[in-house]
């Protein structure tokens, strides 16, 4: 039975990704997340026209940093993307298959994962993207299984015409 190839991150990643620079102040990051209705954002440093991934800032990171700032007072130096980001986020390559992505999302409870080639940010994959791709792959898998299961054996049909009964 021939099945389709497993989808990979490059098949359904978002290539047009909102990013922030590492020196962006915390209050501006919060405003950016709210304005664009994002739950997280990659922190990048530009190398010419290539965005190099430096880290990842989530809503939870901002909540923690803002609450700490309000409770304990203004930190010195002021908080920026550099100071609140996760410095070594879990990343995937464009070739990461759907089952590895599923494992990452179910094991770590992430909402989004950056897609990188080396340090260059290529895109981002969301949990919903993986669910949608897995659903499409599953439906195709079921169709393939049903085709194989109910495949008509043409030899039986052709040979049936020539059956000789005694």
Indicate residue ranges for each PLM-predicted region.
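Tandem CBS (Bateman) regulatory domains
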Residues: 1-15, 58-91, 97-106, 126-166
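A glycine-centered beta-loop-beta connector
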Residues: 33-36, 41-61, 105, 113-129
């Amino acid at each position: 039975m021939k099945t389709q190839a497993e989808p990979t991150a490059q098949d359904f990643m978002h290539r047009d990704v909102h990013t922030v620079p590492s020196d962006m102040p915390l209050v501006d990051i919060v405003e950016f997340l709210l304005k664009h209705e994002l739950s997280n954002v990659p922190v990048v440093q530009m190398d010419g026209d290539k965005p190099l991934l430096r880290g990842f800032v989530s809503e939870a990171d901002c909540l923690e940093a803002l609450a700490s700032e309000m409770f304990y007072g203004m930190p010195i130096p002021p908080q920026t993307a550099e100071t609140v980001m996760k410095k070594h986020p879990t990343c995937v390559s464009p070739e990461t298959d759907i089952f590895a992505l599923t494992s990452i999302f179910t094991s770590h409870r992430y909402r989004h994962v950056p897609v990188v080639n080396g340090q260059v940010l290529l895109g981002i994959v969301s949990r919903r993207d993986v669910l949608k791709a897995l659903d499409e792959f599953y439906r195709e898998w079921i169709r393939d299984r049903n085709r194989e299961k109910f495949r008509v054996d043409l030899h039986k049909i052709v040979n049936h015409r020539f059956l000789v009964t005694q």
